[in-house]
Regions:
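Short alpha-helical DNA-recognition segment
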Residues: 48-67, 346-365
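"A position-specific structural signal for the A-helix of alpha-solenoid helical repeats
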Residues: 110, 144-151, 189, 195-196, ...
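DNA major-groove recognition helix of helix-turn-helix/homeodomain DNA-binding modules
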Residues: 76-93, 375-393, 627
């Protein structure tokens, strides 16, 4: 339970009483993040009536899993992320701060993927050979190697070898795959292997086999109730794969009505997550399906498809990103050693002061020098000392039930749609669901309260900016000194500059410039940290434009658009498009391209159901259409 002092709405001071959380027959009182992610895992497993064997089969023994679920062991990030996805949870919920060996391995994976993504097969092969020697001694790394060899074979036109390798890779974690008729739980990674196999089986003329795989995955998507972040990666591709078979005349057209419901569900998942994965082939099929099932929506689908086709072509994006692999987009892992050292410097602590009596100064020195990885226990202990209690296993928040994470996602959407009453209700629920003894959660709830009071008129922009500034553990002008900030800290910084922008105060632009330096010129990093990058570049390009720096605003807006299209995302896309058009309006030279950009912004706003932005863009288009005439 969380109580506030009587003047909470003005001073935002917390009085904490550890809340009691009931789950099954277990009561917990906890002031650390230890165990939260495994409680979340257990809660979801039991809620979905999955057995231990269901989720650990092929990836670990029941004994290891039971120890993990009871908080008695620390396992590899590969295992934990796979387990999370198998119970339908977005894997980022278990944290992004990795040990040294895991960080290096995932960095090497990303380099291989970049080689394949860019079509540089020779470079990818060489990197894969090195990776296999260094890491190929566990089932997850060996599976990755086999999967990459399958993709290389496919790129070289050897479909026969590719399908054999895809099957071998899948059976590394799903050994009974050939006999599976119903999928109870599956990781995104495993689902993509099945989709790749289905696609190749269809290409080889094995229609019944391909249809069976697609049907299995469609049934899973329909009934699993997994998080939308996972479904956005799987559902659209599975729908398009099955419709390829039906459209070719290899299956019954009576399936169209049922497939239209699947297509609607897939489109809904993309809309909810602001993703564009497989949006074009999905919409092409929906235009056909709607002829018999939903003619009233034809115009909507036509407009969205035409806009996406035109805009993707304009950006040179002529392929489907998720064609073959759940690419490492928005999986920007951080090295926990770096986080610890940056925070030590931030607080002005010597190595000896931070080590204290809990670990040796010599060992801490080796951690800082990246000679060794700290254990999970040591990392948690050091971060607790540094004011980051809860950060090790955090996304934005740390919670033991998936509802809290969904509420946070919904909170942001409320402000887009201006549904402040719902946002207030979400805040109340979050206060009941989160343990504010964890600094990460305390900071998040303070931010939510400030944002609500600002839009409800209880505090003005100047007061809000001051309160946001006070939430940070460092001066705002020092924000650019640190490369690793928690997600909630970045969110607070961006909202601080948003307040200054609304107040037309630009004296602190140098601090904003320094903060944005980490996003400058590192295209791969921006893709890997897409969710934070897209928010940062949206606020910064708007800020620069409003400050009269139109050229720099255009540069950042265009870079943001490039990353959004490359990653097939659309959360700030309409704002970035309008930013460029608005800059040119201020210059007095609105072009046809600006009108195209604003029309695309309108289409995206309509797709998301944002009627306020639709009306705003429509008015701008109407005004400048007349001038173009």
């Amino acid at each position: 339970m969380l109580l506030y002092s009587s003047n909470v709405r003005n001073e935002y001071k917390f009085v904490i009483i550890y809340r009691l959380v009931y789950m099954g027959e277990i009561y917990r009182m906890c002031d650390s993040d230890k165990g939260y992610f495994v409680w979340l895992l257990k809660y979801e497993r039991e809620r979905r009536s999955l057995s231990v064997n269901d989720i650990c089969e092929g990836i670990c023994s029941k004994g290891i899993y039971n120890k993990l679920e009871n908080g008695g062991t620390s396992s590899s990030t590969h295992l934990i992320r796979t387990l999370f996805q198998r119970v339908g949870i977005n894997a980022d919920r278990c944290g992004i701060y990795l040990k040294l060996d895991e960080f290096r391995e995932l960095s090497d994976r990303q380099n291989i993927l970049e080689g394949l993504h860019s079509g540089d097969v020779c470079a990818a092969k060489k990197l894969l050979e090195i990776y296999e020697v260094q890491y190929g001694n566990n089932c997850f790394s060996a599976q990755f190697c086999t999967y990459m060899r399958a993709r290389l074979a496919q790129l070289e036109g050897d479909d026969e070898s590719a399908i054999l390798l895809y099957n071998r890779a899948l059976k590394a974690t799903m050994p009974d795959y050939d006999n599976i008729k119903v999928v109870k739980c599956i990781s995104v990674y495993e689902a993509f292997m099945m989709l790749n196999i289905a696609g190749l089986e269809y290409k080889r003329g094995h229609i019944a086999k391909a249809e069976e795989i697609y049907a299995t995955l469609l049934d899973y998507c329909h009934s699993s109730n997994a998080e939308s972040w996972n479904m956005a990666c799987i559902y659209p591709k599975a729908v398009c794969g099955m419709l390829d078979i039906i459209a070719s005349g290899r299956a019954h057209r009576e399936e169209y009505s049922r497939m239209y419901q699947h297509a609607l569900a897939a489109l809904s998942v993309l809309k909810e997550t602001s993703r564009l994965h497989y949006i074009r082939p999905l919409l092409r099929y929906m235009l056909v399906l709607a002829q018999d099932n939903d003619k009233c929506r034809l115009e909507e689908y036509e407009e969205l498809l035409e806009g996406c086709e035109h805009f993707f072509k304009m950006q040179g994006h002529d392929y489907e990103l998720f064609e073959w692999y759940p690419y490492y987009i928005d999986c920007g892992f951080c090295l926990v050693n770096d986080l610890i050292n940056e925070r030590r410097i931030m607080h002005g602590m010597t190595i000896e002061e931070l080590a204290g009596t809990d670990c040796s100064a010599r060992n801490l020195q080796r951690i800082i020098m990246k000679q060794v990885s700290p254990s999970c226990r040591t990392s948690r202990m050091l971060l607790d000392k540094l004011g980051l209690k809860g950060a090790l296993r955090s996304d934005v928040i740390v919670a033991d039930n998936i509802r809290a994470y969904k509420l946070w996602d919904e909170f942001g959407e409320c402000f887009v749609l201006r549904d402040y009453e719902k946002a207030e209700d979400i805040y109340t629920q979050m206060c009941k669901n989160l343990n504010a003894a964890l600094e990460i959660n305390k900071m998040t709830m303070s931010f939510m309260r400030i944002k609500l009071d600002m839009v409800e008129g209880d505090i003005d922009l100047s007061k809000a900016a001051g309160l946001l500034k006070e939430l940070l553990p460092f001066p705002i002008e020092a924000a650019g000194k640190y490369r690793i900030l928690t997600k909630i800290e970045e969110i607070i910084i961006l909202h601080y500059f948003y307040c200054l922008d609304k107040l037309h105060l630009y004296d602190e632009q140098p601090a904003f410039d320094k903060f944005m330096n980490k996003y400058t010129g590192d295209y791969l990093s921006n893709k890997l940290n897409a969710s934070m990058y897209e928010s940062a570049v949206m606020h910064y390009s708007n800020y620069l434009g409003n400050a009269g720096n139109y050229d720099m605003s255009d540069i950042y807006a265009n870079e943001g658009i490039k990353v959004e299209i490359e990653c097939e995302r659309m959360h700030p896309l309409s704002t970035l498009l309008y930013c460029i058009a608005w800059n040119n309006e201020q210059r007095g030279k609105v072009s046809k391209m600006d009108l195209d950009f604003c029309r695309m912004a309108y289409i995206m706003a309509r797709y998301k159901g944002n009627t306020n932005r639709m009306a705003f863009y429509a008015k701008w288009i109407k005004s400048h259409d007349k001038k173009q005439e």
